[in-house]
Amino acid sequence: MAAMKYKGSVFIILVILLLSSSLLAHSSSTKSFFWLGETQDTKAMKKEKKIDGGTANEVEERQVPTGSDPLHHKHIPFTP
């Protein structure tokens, strides 16, 4: 008879744990913590962080210099 009470209490505890974890997983604030996939919140945050093209003046300022040695101010020949 004691074994039946033990099995019943274990079953009840398991049901409570499963229900509480499923309720926490469906709440919006903890969704990304419980699920491994991306949520809509994280996708929106990634879109906000993307760098846009900018205006024409900003794009002009970011152009890479061209020439014989655009990465160095002084041209020093390579000697082995």
Swiss-Prot record:
<dbReference type="GO" id="GO:0048046">
    <property type="term" value="C:apoplast"/>
</dbReference>
<keyword id="KW-0732">Signal</keyword>
<comment type="similarity">
    <text>Belongs to the CLV3/ESR signal peptide family.</text>
</comment>
<dbReference type="GO" id="GO:0033612">
    <property type="term" value="F:receptor serine/threonine kinase binding"/>
</dbReference>
<dbReference type="GO" id="GO:0001708">
    <property type="term" value="P:cell fate specification"/>
</dbReference>
<keyword id="KW-0221">Differentiation</keyword>
<protein>
    <recommendedName>
        <fullName>CLAVATA3/ESR (CLE)-related protein 40</fullName>
    </recommendedName>
</protein>
<feature type="modified residue" description="Hydroxyproline">
    <location>
        <position position="65"/>
    </location>
</feature>
<dbReference type="GO" id="GO:0045595">
    <property type="term" value="P:regulation of cell differentiation"/>
</dbReference>
<dbReference type="GO" id="GO:0045168">
    <property type="term" value="P:cell-cell signaling involved in cell fate commitment"/>
</dbReference>
<feature type="signal peptide">
    <location>
        <begin position="1"/>
        <end position="25"/>
    </location>
</feature>
<keyword id="KW-0964">Secreted</keyword>
<feature type="region of interest" description="Disordered">
    <location>
        <begin position="45"/>
        <end position="80"/>
    </location>
</feature>
<keyword id="KW-0217">Developmental protein</keyword>
<keyword id="KW-0379">Hydroxylation</keyword>
<dbReference type="GO" id="GO:0010088">
    <property type="term" value="P:phloem development"/>
</dbReference>
<dbReference type="GO" id="GO:0010078">
    <property type="term" value="P:maintenance of root meristem identity"/>
</dbReference>
